[in-house]
Amino acid sequence: APIYMCHPAVFGRVSELATRDDLPVAMHLAGSREEYYFVKRGSSSFSVHGESVRRGFIEIPPWLPTGVSPVRYALNWGAFESPNVLAIHCVHTDEEDVKKLKEYNVAIAVCPRCNAQLGMGVAPVDEFMRAGLRVGIGTDSPAATDSTDMLSEMRLGMLIQRAVNVGRFLDSESMLEMATIGGARAPKLDDELGSLEIGKRPDHHPAQN
């Protein structure tokens, strides 16, 4: 669930259980501008605008606003304490957020078609990769995109990154890596799958020229 739908104490408790039982954790984080402003300022289209007109859909909880970004909000409540955390989206992040994600070895799953279709923005993939984060590409769900077609996700993701990062854009080789071994590294499964190597589980997808 998005972090603004959860009591912040849930983050630390999930981390405790995940650490104890050696479980991975996946969380939607910093996906939209509305989420960013709701967490940081307590104001966005997610909140209730006035007592007489209810245009939002979430009451402002007593622990908001926090004055910090969604990444640092999650960090402050212990969301990154378990050893295998995957943050989905991470569109609205700044330099300090990226440093913290790296410090806590949090992996990133970017979902370009979902982000484009819902008007969420563009994830700073180039910054993630330069920081040495584990980055994979995901399709989100059919509720947010037209399909879960990975090849379509890769193509649109590459084109969007080329459009916003002129001169430092993502090439097809990097995108293929994100979709294969990068996607396996993100949840720490790269010793089992993600590349065609002896001892790994084969996972083939036929492609037609």
Regions found by a protein language model. Give the residues of each.
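Histidine/acidic residue-rich metal-binding segments in metalloenzymes
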Residues: 1-107, 119-135, 191
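Glycine-rich phosphate/pyrophosphate-binding beta-alpha loops
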Residues: 2-5, 110-118, 138-147
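Residue-level marker of alpha-helix boundaries and capping positions
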Residues: 4-5, 88, 115-116, 170-171, ...
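Alpha-helix N-cap/helix-start and coil->helix boundary motif
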Residues: 32, 94, 115, 144, ...
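His/Asp/Glu-enriched, well-ordered alpha-helical/loop segment
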Residues: 76-82, 126-209
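Generic beta-structure capping elements
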Residues: 90, 111, 157-159
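Redox-cofactor binding/interface segments in oxidoreductases and associated redox assembly factors
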Residues: 109-110, 207
